[in-house]
Amino acid sequence: MTKSLSDLLQTNDFTRRHIGPSEAEQAEMLGVLGVSSLDELTQTTLPAAIQFDGELHTGPGMTEAQALAELKAVAQKNKVFRSYIGMGYAGTDVPPVILRNMLENPGWYTAYTPYQAEISQGRLEMLLNFQQTVQDMTGMPVSNASLLDEATAAAEAMTLAKRQSKNKGSNVFFVADNVHPQTMDVVKTRAEYFGFEVQTGSADAIPEGAFGALVQYPGTHGEVLNLAPIAEKAHTQGAALIVATDLLACALLTPPGEQGADIVVGSAQRFGVPMGFGGPHAAFLACQKGFERSMPGRVIGVSKDVRGNTALRMAMQTREQHIRREKATSNICTAQALLANMAAAYAVWHGPEGIKTIAERVHRLTGILAKALQDAGIKANETFFDTLTFEGQDDLGARAEAKGINFRLDGGKVGISLDETVTPQDLADIIEVVTGKGVDVQKLDAEAVDGIPAPLKRQSDFLTHPVFNTHHSEHGMLRYLKQLENKDYSLTHGMIPLGSCTMKLNATTEMIPVTWPEFGGLHPFAPESQTQGYAEMLAELERWLADITGYDAVSMQPNSGAQGEYAGLLVIRKYHEARGEAHRNICLIPASAHGTNPASAAMMGMQVVVVKTDEQGNIDFDDLKAQAEAHSDHLAALMITYPSTHGVYEENVRDVCDLIHQHGGQVYLDGANMNAMVGVAKPGLIGGDVSHLNLHKTFAIPHGGGGPGMGPIGVKAHLAPFLPNHAVAPTSDSHTGAVSAAPYGSASILPISYLYIKLLGAAGLRQSTQVALLNANYIAKRLSGAFPVLYSGKGGRVAHECILDIRPLKQESGVSEEDIAKRLMDYGFHAPTMSFPVPGTLMIEPTESEPKAELDRFVDAMLNIRREIQDVQDGTISAADSPLKHAPHTLKDLMDSEWTRAYSRETGAFPSAAQKAWKYWPAVNRVDNVYGDRNFVCSCPPIEDYIGA
């Protein structure tokens, strides 16, 4: 049959690239399940009451070339001016060796959070480098492996200060008036529902009895304060001192840790990460020893493996939300690992001399500007690192705009912040705009003002570890990055079947715009006239997401799923308050909920009441009804995930939502599992009032080894007036405070989700969901004879993921879910999710992007492992001698001169034919978690330890 021109244009080409199984393979898999089509599978899996049979209004799919061309036209509506606005955002030069080999490299950006340490040693090492960088620059002994942004890091520091302060009975927190306004905004939002009173004033005016104080160093307007007397006063009064600082400034300034700071926060953005209209960037939090077990966020620690070799891991996880739930130190889950790795690589690339040279250049240029201002009779701050502030002339903004320049214009004041991208010509342009006179920058150099007082000049060394003093040639750096990448398992190696994580394809086309200067080069507080491309893209993306979810309004501000939960609950609280029902503070949460749910509710000052689940994994409706009735007058919300965290579509979800509404509550429908709903159901149409969406799951933003992510929220119309706003760049008339430092969160990664939707179109989005269901049910069906599938819904089907019950086998054989997870590494796989939501289980989510061959390879590996367990059950080999207990096997194991194990080397490392064609090698043997927590070290070990490993 002759193809038409329409056929030849291949407008659906991307859909078949994104979806793993071919049409023929889909037909074969559908046959295994006993259905004839994807539509039949959908209709027989989803409850009839929730099915959406219409068509999404996202348009038809298009080719990759078409989509890129259209988005490029939108991006070019942005005007990339030279922005000297500052406020925690600075221009930076991304070293090309890092840009190409890390940021644009799927070996780095498609990996998951390094819970499985044995196959994550590369990024764990770079994250440890990040921690060391932060510790060295700030002068602090302990730091974490990134937070979402500087403002939320400050808010996290506030609650850490509360836990550590000597003033246990105090609810007063002090914020100096030299703190960035967006930080002030986020801190006030966070403080409200903790019951904290935020007081402000000059940095040295810490009130008696405050539990903590936050100051900026250098200040938002550029001044450099002596922190030592402020720290002394804070400590005398029993308060913890938090300092928000600039890593580059700390190359020249006496670091906060040497002046008495208890906690130091900030952003590592100017260490080689583009501004990106607000993000993503890696924030940091460092603290004194003794604070670490209350510290928020992931911390990388040094441990050892079973052979005694140095091995890295995520340390002290018992303080995190996935274990402590509502008692966790924070609800943080996704952080900014990829951006932290970039910042660490920047420090490795430049080394101490390079970093100091950049800092000296920025300071010298600022000193020349200070001299030019003096000569023009303009009075600016006398102490500074990179920022000068002075009274402005009425027409200065217009003159700057005509020159393609942005200054900070704030209440009659003008702020100018310089950065590493500024050239002498740029500085000459700035001076001409401000003074109206041309100058010779080189001649002014000899008269440059020194803005750092002698007592505040840094004397201590930094970045002394060999890793920061070795890789300064491009070949050296290239090979170091590659060596680390080769230690890690990512989607470039195979399927990452983590349940509740949706490790789908991050298509190359979707990633391309992330590094376009039109998106990366914009300051988040640039004038609206310069950001029209972003405005157009954001408006369309918000409209699409509202349509997909069945909600009426969307906020793009939350920059993680956990922050989306927090924002959604904030909206609910504001709604109740506006109705005169501020007393509503009870949040009902099923026992099976993700740990971020109760942690987020606790952060919103809500009392968590746990609802039972039944033997099928569903919400116990009788218990829910009893709890709703018992707490009716104070019921604020129910938080549920749909499909449930047990991987099934609960039949009575509409009844559940109706019950909550009858008692005056709102329904927070967690969108973590939205990959099972797009195009086939809408949370806003089944009773949800608000949901967050994990764009780094459902909408193809890569996980980055632990971030970035985005967690926008959709709400019904009655909640729309209460969406988060922003003090610096208002997005609405809402009086709700900000939850992120930037008004649109991590805006520069939103083009990924935009292209994902545009490329697939309405039909492709629906088909992707259907194939996600197909792949999960295919795996469940093939494995059900070997491992019990714990929960299933209508017709014995699962949703987009399935849970295998390992507990009976563990009881009979002594082989645990952890043993299976580690053994899968020998077969060339990342482990499924372990012991969530049920201890002793494995939760598998293959996503729609995995081809049938990969699904079969995984099933075959699991069936082989089941046979290995059977050998233990039959007494052929003891559990202790089994390859399952010794997994994973490394190349060093095979190189041992003596092999005394009860199985062959080949059985250990090459358990199936697939490994003989291609083999992924774990970098270390099983890591000793207990040793790592008992001997906590979160800085870089001696280089000899790496060599020994």
UniProtKB/Swiss-Prot annotation:
It catalyses: N(6)-[(R)-lipoyl]-L-lysyl-[glycine-cleavage complex H protein] + glycine + H(+) = N(6)-[(R)-S(8)-aminomethyldihydrolipoyl]-L-lysyl-[glycine-cleavage complex H protein] + CO2. It comes from the Bacteria. Keywords: Oxidoreductase, Pyridoxal phosphate. Its cofactor is pyridoxal 5'-phosphate. One of its GO terms (biological process) is glycine decarboxylation via glycine cleavage system. GO terms for molecular function: glycine binding; glycine dehydrogenase (decarboxylating) activity; pyridoxal phosphate binding. Pfam families: GcvP2_C, GDC-P. The modification N6-(pyridoxal phosphate)lysine is found at K697. It is an enzyme of class 1 (oxidoreductase). GO terms for cellular component: cytosol; glycine cleavage complex. The glycine cleavage system is composed of four proteins: P, T, L and H. Belongs to the GcvP family. This is Glycine dehydrogenase (decarboxylating). It comes from Deinococcus radiodurans (strain ATCC 13939 / DSM 20539 / JCM 16871 / CCUG 27074 / LMG 4051 / NBRC 15346 / NCIMB 9279 / VKM B-1422 / R1).
